[in-house]
Swiss-Prot record:
One GO CC term, this protein: large ribosomal subunit
Protein name: Large ribosomal subunit protein uL1
Organism (species): Thermofilum pendens (strain DSM 2475 / Hrk 5)
Gene Ontology BP, a term: regulation of translation
Pfam families recorded: Ribosomal_L1
Length: 225
């Protein structure tokens, strides 16, 4: 089922507009627009009911692109640098990081997505697994013969949607300066991905809020149970 059949046309836009208008006075920084989806009748204690996936947004926020780290050696590392990866970590550097707990934590915190050369995945797991795993950031293996520049660009414009211990999913869909229509399209992309995992009866409520604003609920009348 698509997000369009779950939520009536225009309802997301209306809730986003209200969230923008009801936010406190202008801040000295550009506030993020966050989407919160609460679920019902989902047992989060069961691993199969948890969600950790990536959604490419149709309209990524200007100046808020995700940071992508590539772990690779040789030709793949060279291509990753040419493709503009935010950082490229080769095998030797990875092993050094493994002996530096502070550096490993910093790497895991600073970058949003990790891509790794397939033959380095076991080493990545041993060296960085305990730092990336709890954050839901374990690397994606780089497919053979992939256009690395396109792959990196896709992750740059993506957000991670993750549900762990609570039946709730929250992610940033943009910033307050973006057009409402763009924010709504981003929200629909996220909702469509959630619906691949959880059918409409499991969708309880949808909210939007700014960083410093109050949550605004999408009208219940348009969320079809």
């Amino acid at each position: 089922m698509s997000s369009q059949t779950l939520v009536a046309a225009g309802s997301l836009e209306e809730a986003i507009k209200e969230a923008l208008v009801s936010s406190p006075k202008k801040r000295r920084f550009t506030q993020s627009v966050e989407m919160i989806v609460t679920l019902r009748d989902v047992d989060v204690k069961k691993p199969e009911n948890r969600l950790n996936t990536v959604v490419a947004l149709p309209h990524p926020a200007p100046g808020k692109l995700a940071k992508v780290a590539v772990i690779a050696s040789g030709d793949t590392a060279l291509k990753a640098k040419e493709a503009g990866a935010d950082i490229v970590v080769d095998k030797d550097e990875l092993q050094k990081i493994g002996n530096d707990k502070k550096a490993a934590k910093k790497l895991a915190k600073r970058y949003d997505f990790f891509l790794a050369q397939p033959d380095l995945m076991p080493l990545v797991g041993r060296v960085l697994g305990k730092y990336l795993g709890p954050r839901g950031k374990m690397p994606q293996p780089i497919p053979p013969n992939v256009a690395l520049d396109a792959l990196i660009e896709r992750f740059r414009r993506s957000v991670r949607i993750r549900m762990k211990d609570e039946p709730q999913i929250a992610c940033r869909i943009g910033v307050e300066t973006q057009p409402v229509e763009h924010l709504a399209e981003n929200a629909r992309a996220v909702l469509a991905e959630i619906l691949k995992k959880f059918p409409p009866p499991n969708i309880d409520r949808i909210y939007f809020k700014l960083t410093m604003g109050r949550p605004v609920k999408v009208s219940r009348e348009v969320v079809r149970k």
